[in-house]
């Protein structure tokens, strides 16, 4: 399955919620009719079956983290193998992706931009360049911007935007040095309450 390259707001409208695919701190509902699906008949909100609701939730989470279908299914399988709650495990695995950590630390304005920084070899983990977006960051790992990338205007702009967002408690970031520490794996209570991971577990359990 190819990565979606179309309008980002269209995806958020499809899911009926802000997927945080655009940079900035202005609420997305001031930019478009977020509650109305895209298309000519968007105002007619279809009534979904249980399966439809589960599928929409899976698509929403997959799009938030920018993960392709096969990758997402593999994350679910890994989450199911781990001890504890499968849904919480799934979200923790997604949060541990390097591109997501770079975004959470404020080095990229969006997850897509953060993924690009990683693929362009602008990110280091524990002093070594890592260019794999899906790399799993471990507790106490130090994530930093490579020296020659620190002058990039997009990195500076992203850090300014990050100052206006709530800072994740599981990360420690030094904006001046452009580096941060992944202190711990986030608890489920640390993450968005707008995600209903139980629906995803129900979908894949069938």
UniProtKB/Swiss-Prot annotation:
What sequence ranges are listed for the domain S4 RNA-binding? Answer: 96-156
Query: Which Gene3D superfamilies does this chain map to?
Result: Ribosomal Protein S4 Delta 41, Chain A, domain 1 (1.10.1050.10), RNA-binding S4 domain (3.10.290.10)
Family annotation (InterPro entries): Ribosomal_uS4, Ribosomal_uS4_bac-type, Ribosomal_uS4_CS, Ribosomal_uS4_N, S4_RNA-bd, S4_RNA-bd_sf
Q: Where is the signal peptide?
A: none
Could you tell me the keywords of this UniProt record? Ribonucleoprotein, Ribosomal protein, RNA-binding, rRNA-binding
Cited PROSITE patterns: RIBOSOMAL_S4, S4
GO-annotated cellular components? small ribosomal subunit
MF term (GO), any: structural constituent of ribosome
Does the record's keyword annotation contain Repeat?
A: no
Q: Name the family.
A: Belongs to the universal ribosomal protein uS4 family.
Protein's job:
One of the primary rRNA binding proteins, it binds directly to 16S rRNA where it nucleates assembly of the body of the 30S subunit. With S5 and S12 plays an important role in translational accuracy.
The protein's name is: Small ribosomal subunit protein uS4
